[in-house]
Amino acid sequence: MAEPDYIEDDNPELIRPQKLINPVKTSRNHQDLHRELLMNQKRGLAPQNKPELQKVMEKRKRDQVIKQKEEEAQKKKSDLEIELLKRQQKLEQLELEKQKLQEEQENAPEFVKVKGNLRRTGQEVAQAQES
Protein backbone atom coordinates (compact mmCIF):
# COMPACT_ATOMS: atom_id res chain seq x y z
CA MET A 1 0.00 0.00 0.00
CA ALA A 2 1.09 3.51 -0.64
CA GLU A 3 1.97 5.48 2.45
CA PRO A 4 0.80 9.06 2.86
CA ASP A 5 3.20 11.96 2.24
CA TYR A 6 3.04 13.37 5.75
CA ILE A 7 4.89 10.38 7.23
CA GLU A 8 8.08 11.10 5.29
CA ASP A 9 8.02 14.87 5.67
CA ASP A 10 8.87 16.27 9.06
CA ASN A 11 6.95 19.45 8.47
CA PRO A 12 5.80 20.77 11.88
CA GLU A 13 3.05 22.87 10.28
CA LEU A 14 1.07 19.82 9.22
CA ILE A 15 -1.48 18.37 11.55
CA ARG A 16 -1.02 14.66 11.73
CA PRO A 17 -4.16 12.52 11.96
CA GLN A 18 -4.67 10.56 15.13
CA LYS A 19 -6.77 7.51 15.68
CA LEU A 20 -10.12 8.46 17.19
CA ILE A 21 -11.04 7.01 20.55
CA ASN A 22 -14.32 5.14 20.71
CA PRO A 23 -15.94 6.26 23.97
CA VAL A 24 -18.25 3.24 24.07
CA LYS A 25 -15.44 0.70 23.92
CA THR A 26 -13.32 2.52 26.46
CA SER A 27 -16.12 2.74 29.02
CA ARG A 28 -15.89 0.28 31.88
CA ASN A 29 -19.62 -0.52 31.79
CA HIS A 30 -19.44 -1.52 28.15
CA GLN A 31 -16.45 -3.77 28.75
CA ASP A 32 -18.19 -5.49 31.68
CA LEU A 33 -21.38 -5.98 29.71
CA HIS A 34 -19.49 -7.35 26.72
CA ARG A 35 -17.56 -9.76 28.94
CA GLU A 36 -20.79 -10.94 30.57
CA LEU A 37 -22.48 -11.49 27.20
CA LEU A 38 -19.52 -13.54 25.98
CA MET A 39 -19.59 -15.69 29.11
CA ASN A 40 -23.35 -16.26 28.80
CA GLN A 41 -22.97 -17.19 25.15
CA LYS A 42 -20.29 -19.75 26.02
CA ARG A 43 -22.55 -21.26 28.67
CA GLY A 44 -25.50 -21.32 26.30
CA LEU A 45 -27.56 -18.74 28.15
CA ALA A 46 -29.21 -16.21 25.90
CA PRO A 47 -30.33 -12.95 27.52
CA GLN A 48 -33.37 -12.59 25.24
CA ASN A 49 -34.90 -15.94 26.25
CA LYS A 50 -38.32 -15.41 27.78
CA PRO A 51 -40.09 -17.75 30.17
CA GLU A 52 -42.28 -20.32 28.45
CA LEU A 53 -45.46 -19.00 30.06
CA GLN A 54 -44.77 -15.51 28.75
CA LYS A 55 -44.17 -16.88 25.23
CA VAL A 56 -47.46 -18.81 25.31
CA MET A 57 -49.39 -15.79 26.55
CA GLU A 58 -47.93 -13.56 23.84
CA LYS A 59 -48.79 -16.13 21.17
CA ARG A 60 -52.38 -16.37 22.42
CA LYS A 61 -52.70 -12.62 22.42
CA ARG A 62 -51.37 -12.40 18.84
CA ASP A 63 -53.79 -15.13 17.70
CA GLN A 64 -56.68 -13.37 19.39
CA VAL A 65 -55.84 -10.07 17.68
CA ILE A 66 -55.64 -11.82 14.30
CA LYS A 67 -59.04 -13.46 14.84
CA GLN A 68 -60.59 -10.13 15.80
CA LYS A 69 -59.23 -8.50 12.65
CA GLU A 70 -60.63 -11.31 10.50
CA GLU A 71 -64.05 -11.03 12.16
CA GLU A 72 -64.09 -7.27 11.64
CA ALA A 73 -63.17 -7.75 7.99
CA GLN A 74 -66.07 -10.19 7.57
CA LYS A 75 -68.48 -7.80 9.27
CA LYS A 76 -67.47 -4.99 6.93
CA LYS A 77 -68.60 -6.84 3.80
CA SER A 78 -70.21 -4.65 1.19
CA ASP A 79 -73.74 -5.08 -0.13
CA LEU A 80 -72.38 -6.60 -3.33
CA GLU A 81 -70.46 -9.26 -1.41
CA ILE A 82 -73.55 -10.08 0.65
CA GLU A 83 -75.68 -10.50 -2.49
CA LEU A 84 -73.01 -12.65 -4.12
CA LEU A 85 -72.89 -14.88 -1.05
CA LYS A 86 -76.69 -15.26 -1.10
CA ARG A 87 -76.64 -16.23 -4.77
CA GLN A 88 -73.84 -18.68 -4.17
CA GLN A 89 -75.80 -20.32 -1.35
CA LYS A 90 -78.91 -20.57 -3.54
CA LEU A 91 -76.91 -22.18 -6.34
CA GLU A 92 -75.40 -24.67 -3.91
CA GLN A 93 -78.86 -25.58 -2.61
CA LEU A 94 -80.15 -26.10 -6.16
CA GLU A 95 -77.19 -28.33 -6.98
CA LEU A 96 -77.82 -30.39 -3.85
CA GLU A 97 -81.48 -30.80 -4.78
CA LYS A 98 -80.55 -31.91 -8.31
CA GLN A 99 -78.09 -34.43 -6.92
CA LYS A 100 -80.75 -35.80 -4.55
CA LEU A 101 -83.23 -36.19 -7.41
CA GLN A 102 -80.66 -37.97 -9.55
CA GLU A 103 -79.76 -40.30 -6.69
CA GLU A 104 -83.44 -41.07 -6.08
CA GLN A 105 -83.95 -41.84 -9.76
CA GLU A 106 -80.88 -44.05 -9.87
CA ASN A 107 -81.91 -45.92 -6.73
CA ALA A 108 -85.52 -46.39 -7.85
CA PRO A 109 -86.61 -49.90 -8.94
CA GLU A 110 -86.70 -50.70 -12.65
CA PHE A 111 -90.51 -50.93 -12.93
CA VAL A 112 -90.87 -47.35 -11.57
CA LYS A 113 -88.51 -46.07 -14.24
CA VAL A 114 -90.37 -47.90 -17.00
CA LYS A 115 -93.72 -46.61 -15.72
CA GLY A 116 -92.39 -43.02 -15.77
CA ASN A 117 -91.11 -43.48 -19.31
CA LEU A 118 -94.51 -44.85 -20.44
CA ARG A 119 -96.31 -41.86 -18.94
CA ARG A 120 -93.97 -39.42 -20.68
CA THR A 121 -94.31 -41.13 -24.04
CA GLY A 122 -98.10 -41.25 -23.60
CA GLN A 123 -98.20 -37.54 -22.85
CA GLU A 124 -95.96 -36.76 -25.82
CA VAL A 125 -98.18 -38.78 -28.16
CA ALA A 126 -101.28 -36.99 -26.85
CA GLN A 127 -99.69 -33.59 -27.37
CA ALA A 128 -98.58 -34.54 -30.89
CA GLN A 129 -102.14 -35.61 -31.81
CA GLU A 130 -103.62 -32.38 -30.45
CA SER A 131 -101.22 -30.25 -32.47
From Swiss-Prot:
The modification N-acetylalanine is found at A2. It comes from Homo sapiens. Keywords: Acetylation, Coiled coil. It holds the Pfam family DUF1151. Belongs to the FAM107 family. The gene is FAM107B. The keyword Disulfide bond does not apply. This is Protein FAM107B. Residues 61-112 form a coiled coil.
